Amino acid sequence: MSDLSAHTPMMQQYWKLKNQHPDQLMFYRMGDFYEIFYEDAKKAAKLLDITLTARGQSAGQSIPMCGIPFHSLEGYLAKLVKLGESVVICEQIGDPATSKGPVERQVVRIITPGTVSDEALLDERRDNLIAALLGDERLFGLAVLDITSGNFSVQEIKGWENLLAELERLNPVELLIPDDWPRDLPAEKRPGARRRAPWDFDRDSARKALCQQFATKDLKGFGCDKLTLAIGAAGCLLTYAKETQRTALPHLRSLRHERLDDTVILDGASRRNLELDINLAGGRDNTLQSVIDRCQTAMASRLLSRWLNRPLRDLKVLQARQDSIRCLLDSYRFEKLQPQLKEIGDIERILARIGLRNARPRDLARLRDALGALPELQNAMTELEAPHLARLAAITGTYPELASLLERAIIDNPPAVIRDGGVLKAGYDNELDELLAISENAGQFLIDLEAREKARTGLANLKVGYNRVHGYFIELPTKQAEQAPGDYIRRQTLKGAERFITPELKAFEDKALSAKSRALAREKMLYDALLETLISHLAPLQDSAAALAELDVLSNLAERALNLDLNCPRFVDEPCLRIEQGRHPVVEQVLTTPFVANDLGLDNSTRMLIITGPNMGGKSTYMRQTALIVLLAHIGSFVPAASCELSLVDRIFTRIGSSDDLAGGRSTFMVEMSETANILHNATDRSLVLMDEVGRGTSTFDGLSLAWAAAERLAQLRAYTLFATHYFELTVLPESEPLVANVHLNATEHNERIVFLHHVLPGPASQSYGLAVAQLAGVPTAVIQRAREHLGRLETTSLPHEQPAAHKAKDAPQVPHQSDLFASLPHPAIEKLGKLQLDDMTPRQAIEMLYQLKNLL
């Protein structure tokens, strides 16, 4: 709103502030409430389910309004942040008692989904990331910031495909893009995408701002000096963070250069299908992390999630982690460390809040307890001889001076906020103790003073009192007023009484009337000074937090290795993937019966397995467990297998299951083909590829042709491939492609019911058991019976598919029979004969039916 002259002074002040933040909800402090006006009020009332009302008039119109009590702010903020909204907090900074006109107000905080730091607004086991993006169709600079930990990274990525896969991995809650980019770009479709002015991405300004933030002359030390696009994106992020926090950011100390080549790349479909930390329903149950995460601290859980979503190809790092896990397993050393690690808590985020100067008293109490636990933990770590663990121990250190300071300063169980005081211990500051004593002991002082004055003057009717208008006084009956001592100064005359004050009482009054407010101000000043002291030690404290989080993850992986029967994989130079008695780590935990372990062997002689077998026979489980074993190996973990030998892989692809993409206007088959195309374009001879039921979303012959061609292409690429299919024609591929082999999941039928044995055996399956699975699923008996009739008719009249000429050799494998859906219909007599229920017929009925059948011939 530009013309403010018609508004009241209060609303003029409001609009001057609101015009600076047009796209964010403004919470405007008025006394004990945050008021919300105009369109913000209508939106907030709906989102928060609070009453919308009106507040008088301004500019001739009533003002839509809603409000919340100031002490309930955090709960409402949490709800709005979860809904993706941003909120501007506008506080009163002037004194209402001395202000002429509206009390002075200013914006003190801007809360956005990506820049929140309050514990109540965060998921403790998930990173809360904000990203910025700059580039063109060919090359992109991506910067990512977690303001709750100080982790700040940059990278440059080629092409939309790789960029979208990386955004899927990071899942930032906010994504900043230049306002001059074309509309409807793929990145803008992500939730939380926000446009920023192009000058926020200026590369020269960004470089200067980053060097100033890190107190360096250039960015060469971070290995990203030449990443101009990423630097522009990082500069935008830094500006945005400072704009929202309204304070310096001392906990942002460095910039990490990430490279896709250092990682095993998983696209979005693969992450979803493997259910690493989010299941297909969007929850966390029955995910890989739910099984392998028994970390003692939330910061370690977040680190483990980062490892799972960013497996490494750096053999030195992986072997260092393996050695650390072995060391922690030796003599069950992890059991001694884990209870001590639990005492550390989430100091990573506590330190970030200290850096942002919004740490709460309970944050400092938790930091005090963590620092107090470090010496005992440090002693336990001296026994760990693994080189990587020794480095972590050296980084961790101890902080006796800070621990002592916090022990002297913070009471055992402090209140949630500093606002009302009661945080600092007695004895920490003499002036504060005196002010608190005056405030808390005023009543006793007056009682003692009255007793002393009665004794001094001999006036038994003397009283000491207080009222808000005249303050403290000594009261005497009018008849005794003339006997008042010389140091009594007349203050007030009443009917029948005179009130006096003495120099001693006046001095006490001056202290007492302001003692409480002065005590609160003094305590806040001391608390802020305490934060500044901690900020001066922030760098080593953050390094210690990172080391402790990694120690926690490694201890957790050792505990999981012991209790889940995991074994150390061995990386080799020879291209291979050999697994003995491999298991699915998640399925194994939910089964009530023993899990059937299986072997897998892929090397230079066999690069692809064609997997056949019945639905529910275990094909998808076998494929997924292979991918999870490979992924766990690439985070340095032990794996669910008796043994595992593998070479480093560059990518893991999964095309398992599909659903349509209604929002994107794509059918199930289109989604399936898009995922297949991505695999065929990007897979290499170092990639692991899982393909399940390719081609099932279209007609039989189209689907078979596509599946066949895709399998041939993957065989030619020499990718490590598990190709599950119900197209039995594909089982002849080994005859034309020497790197392909057949395996199947076995099953048997007993009393017309299927029994899944889940063993992976060489060769193709003999049949698909489709009707048996349908019966197991509860399809009505009549429908199953009718299906058997149709199946019998089709198998009786169909012609076998002719094999390609290349596969007609006499030693070609026997392909299980597939029905020809286009064969001629059976003779009516045969069809009627197939429907007969012979066990229900009498001899006479059987003879009559025989004559009827003869007449049909």
From Swiss-Prot:
Superkingdom in the source lineage: Bacteria
Q: Which organism is it from?
A: Pseudomonas putida (strain ATCC 47054 / DSM 6125 / CFBP 8728 / NCIMB 11950 / KT2440)
The name this protein carries in UniProt is: DNA mismatch repair protein MutS
A biological process (GO) of this protein is: mismatch repair
Upper lineage is: Bacteria, Pseudomonadati, Pseudomonadota, Gammaproteobacteria, Pseudomonadales
As for what it does, the entry says: This protein is involved in the repair of mismatches in DNA. It is possible that it carries out the mismatch recognition step. This protein has a weak ATPase activity.
Name the residues that bind ATP. Answer: 613-620
* CDD domains xrefs: ABC_MutS1
Per UniProt, which keywords does this protein have?
A: ATP-binding, DNA damage, DNA repair, DNA-binding, Nucleotide-binding
**Does the entry feature the keyword RNA-binding, yes or no?**
no
Question: What's the family?
Answer: Belongs to the DNA mismatch repair MutS family.
**Gene behind this chain?**
mutS
